[in-house]
């Protein structure tokens, strides 16, 4: 089940990331055509974007000239400013592999008490799962504005509620079917 879930998560991540890349390419093609066929209209869009950011007069004209003189920068600016797309793209396969690896790494931790045939395996598994949720949340704080403690407890609470619901549904279905 762990492997199947890992593959499922990796496939979902791959498809989601691939969709982002496809969307980026689609809008890039649109902007390239606009620049080729209606450059003045696109130049005016650049001007409007930077006017809205507070530039005026000579500074505005200079920024517009600098950006539109460099086709790659012009397209990149349009993609970021007009469509809100990121400056860099993730690689779908790489993202999927990271997801799969992380899922396996953290997903195996709750199984340790069963593999080691520990007394009270279920309780130990719950304990290890809680620690794992907290650690994942703490690591997540690296990309967040929240403290490691806050992120750790946030993930612990959400993970515990989710795991409890899943366990409860499984228990209910087990009793329903037996």
Region annotations inferred by a language model:
Residues 167-178:
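Juxtamembrane boundary at the C-terminal end of a transmembrane helix
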Residues 1-16:
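Internal alpha-helical transmembrane segments
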Residues 119-131:
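Structural signature of hydrophobic alpha-helical transmembrane segments
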């Amino acid at each position: 089940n762990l492997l199947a879930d890992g593959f499922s998560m990796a496939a979902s991540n791959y498809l989601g990331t691939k969709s982002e890349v496809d969307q980026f390419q689609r809008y890039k093609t649109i902007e390239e055509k606009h620049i080729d066929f209606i450059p003045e209209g696109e130049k005016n869009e650049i001007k409007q974007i930077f006017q809205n950011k507070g530039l005026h007069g000579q500074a505005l004209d200079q920024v517009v000239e600098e950006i539109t003189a460099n086709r790659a920068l012009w397209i990149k600016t349009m993609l970021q400013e007009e469509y809100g797309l990121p400056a860099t793209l993730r690689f779908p396969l790489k993202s999927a592999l990271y997801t799969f690896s992380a899922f396996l790494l953290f997903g195996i931790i709750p199984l340790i008490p069963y593999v080691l045939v520990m007394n009270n395996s279920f309780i130990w598994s719950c304990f290890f799962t809680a620690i794992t949720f907290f650690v994942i949340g703490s690591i997540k704080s690296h990309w967040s504005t929240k403290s490691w403690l806050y992120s750790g407890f946030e993930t612990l609470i959400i993970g515990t509620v989710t795991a409890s619901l899943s366990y409860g549904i499984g228990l209910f279905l087990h009793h329903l079917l037996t």
